[in-house]
Amino acid sequence: MLTPSTAGALRVPGRGNTMSKILLMAESGSDITPELAGQLGVTIVPMHVTFAGETRDDGAFPVTQMFEHYKATREPPRTSGCTPHDFEVAFGRVLEENPGAQILYLAYSACTTCSMQSAVMVADGREDIRIIDTKSVSAGQMAVVMRVAKALQAHPEMTLDEAAAIAKDAIAKVRMGFIPGDLDYLRAGGRVSNAAYLGAKILGLHPLIEVQDGKLISTKKYRGSMARVIAQMAREYPEANALRKDEVYLIYGEGLAQSIRQEVEGILQEKGYAVRGWVRTGCVIAAHSGPGSFGIVGFAE
């Protein structure tokens, strides 16, 4: 079972068990846990969250602390991507500890944050660093990273061009949709207007947000209780997106009821989908989706 990151500092696992000359890198917004990063040999660079007058590394504190602060003050948390300095440290440390290695950085959607731009500035002109926009976030980015990491473990002799080709194929096929747990976070952060927020509250509407070409797009609105709309999404989303049945990941925000999680797994298993794990949202996604969010990630056939 996949669980959230619990450490915000730069995590450099080295070559892991693969001994590949290619080392992967991603941001904490991918919601890859320290344990999984170690298994896959992925370096995690922290993104940042500002609340209570302090900017902190994503993953360095529990997401509940952020939720409690917002509940008490109504001051929305703000998120920011990795800085050029973050990548100077990350690239430098990885290459120093792994002489002769190459880095493949699979970036959090460049449409949503400055992280990739920061990395490009630092890596400019370097042939030992390759940067690819995953055009996804959270577990969508994680799924792409996992696919490349497993390919490298199976074929450690793989070239950087070959690994990049696998990444691009995965990026073209990955699909992600989620339902925010609390629209108040989207409204407070300026992601939805007050009018749209009030209308949704009055009518009991829950928007489905899909990641399309790196952008977060509201594609549909469900009506009813959170339990009802999540069950409906679980029935509709995988088939509507022609997801492969052998690899589905489920996303949940802190506070999503265990009974809802069990119901969703039952629905998907009845349809023949293999749930590979639950991914709990870290602070970057949770700052916008709030507690109790739900999402589905998979690869199109």
Question: What is each model feature region?
Answer:
Residues 29-43, 48-50, 102, 115-130, ...:
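Mixed-charge interfacial surface used for oligomerization/domain docking
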Residues 2-18:
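Short, Lys/Arg-enriched N-terminal segments with co-localized hydrophobic residues
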Residues 73-110, 118, 164, 171-172:
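Glycine-rich phosphate- or other oxyanion-binding loops that anchor nucleotides, phosphorylated ligands
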Residues 24-25, 78, 105, 131, ...:
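Short catalytic-loop micro-motif centered on adjacent basic/acidic residues
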Residues 22-86:
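N-terminal glycine-rich anion-binding loop in soluble enzyme alpha/beta folds
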Residues 107-109, 132-135:
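Short beta-strand->loop
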Residues 14-21, 90-94, 107-113, 191-197:
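An N-terminal domain-start capping segment
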